[in-house]
Each structure stands twice: as structure tokens, then as C-alpha cells.
Amino acid sequence: MSGEDLTNLNKIEHIVVLMMENRSFDHLLGYLALEGGRTDVDGLTSDMFNISTNGTVHRIHHLENTTFELDPCHEGNGVDEQISNNNGGFVLNFERMCRPVDPGGVMGYHNAADLPVYDHLAREFTICDRWFSS
């Protein structure tokens, strides 16, 4: 940090961290890289997919509405399955836990038009695209 950077730290009065429970970064803000063209965001890319047990390829896709009826598993074993194989287990876990729903639904995302308040916050403030917690 330069001396000027350290001086500017005195101007900061508050730090607010907004964490969204049970939503992934890609689900809510991944579009910033895909549709928003931001190269500074580790978000979605057009080549992302997961495969279900019957071999169906489920690609990322824009969700039709902002209501997600089912809740993917959040227990330790479920999360382990989801992130195993280079994050390739999301559809498999969702398919197993939420039958008979379309397992590809878990590969959906929202965009700026769906979530204008989040979009505004993401464009005006710092976002943490590599935030991990347990």
C-alpha cells in the first residue's frame, strides 16, 4: 500500500458485509461475468455444465422466475457431493435429494433484470467472488 492508500483508510467509517444464505455466488451474481462482460469477476462461463445420472447434460441457463421452489441440500455430506469432481456434483445431488423435479434447475442463474437491487449493489461496491465459509 502506498502512503496515500493508508491515509484514505481513515475515511472509511463502516464496512458492511451482506451475505446471502443458501444462495451461491453464481446463482445471484455469476451473470456479471457471463452477461455483464466483467473480467474482474470469477463468475459464470458459457461452457459450464453438470451431468445427471441418466447422462443428460445440464448447462447453465437463465431462470424463468425468481422463485426457486426446492432447496438443495446444505448438510456436510450433500455439499461434499456437490463440490466434488471439480464442482460436478450439483445436478447429481439435487436430482437425488429433490425428485421428481428437473435436476437441471440447480444450474440456473438470475441476471440484472431479475435482481436490480443486487445488480446496483454489485456495480457500486466491492463484491467477494472468492468467498468461502463453513
Positions of the model-derived regions?
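N-terminal pro-sequences and low-complexity stem/linker regions of secreted or lumenal proteins
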Residues: 1-134
